[in-house]
């Protein structure tokens, strides 16, 4: 069986993308790249003036960032960051499809419409999106205790972070 050289696993935060992606990549002998890591790299070579959404957490503990923003602000920052990241993600995907080693990209930055637009001219690309019920997303967020441990107000952090993920899941499926 021949597989496309570039695979994508997208979906909302905490749905299980990273776990699924690592298993698939290992089974196929592919590299595995998280869009979270791409975002960190982009942040390291940009400024708040050029990439404001990528720098939304600058100088703020991530737990305080989530607890202190509205759900709408969190979603706007996330979607804006993904837009800022997309040129770099697309360039990497095209390089791997054309001449580099097979790779699986995973992350919530893999917005369906952006990836679908590439399917028209990239025959070495295949994608899947994981979704979950609101209840499962809540269970997974609450189960990720290391993520919110140390927050000054854990329930407030979850009360903002979880609805952001649920709304992203809903928008992604629309």
Residue ranges, per PLM feature:
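Phosphate-binding P-loop
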Residues: 1-4
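ATP-binding Walker
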Residues: 12-15
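Walker A/P-loop
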Residues: 18
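Glycine-rich phosphate-binding loop used to anchor ATP phosphates in small-molecule kinases
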Residues: 66-122, 129
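A glycine- and Lys/Arg-enriched "phosphate-lid" helix/loop adjacent to the NTP-binding pocket
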Residues: 122-169
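NTP-dependent small-molecule kinase module
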Residues: 170-174
């Amino acid at each position: 069986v021949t597989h496309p050289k570039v695979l994508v696993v997208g979906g909302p935060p905490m749905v299980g993308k990273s776990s699924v992606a690592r298993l698939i990549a290992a089974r196929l002998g592919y590299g595995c790249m998280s869009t979270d890591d791409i975002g960190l790299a982009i942040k390291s070579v940009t400024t708040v003036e050029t990439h404001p959404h990528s720098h939304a957490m600058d100088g703020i503990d991530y737990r305080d960032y989530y607890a202190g923003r509205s759900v709408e602000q969190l979603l706007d920052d996330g979607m804006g960051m993904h837009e800022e990241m997309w040129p770099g993600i697309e360039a990497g995907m095209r390089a791997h499809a054309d001449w580099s080693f097979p790779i699986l990209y995973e992350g919530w930055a893999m917005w369906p419409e952006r990836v679908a637009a590439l399917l028209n001219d990239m025959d070495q690309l295949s994608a899947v999106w994981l979704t979950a019920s609101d209840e499962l997303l809540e269970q997974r967020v609450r189960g990720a205790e290391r993520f919110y441990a140390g927050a000054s107000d854990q329930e407030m952090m979850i009360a903002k972070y979880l609805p952001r993920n649920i709304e992203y899941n809903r928008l992604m499926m629309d």
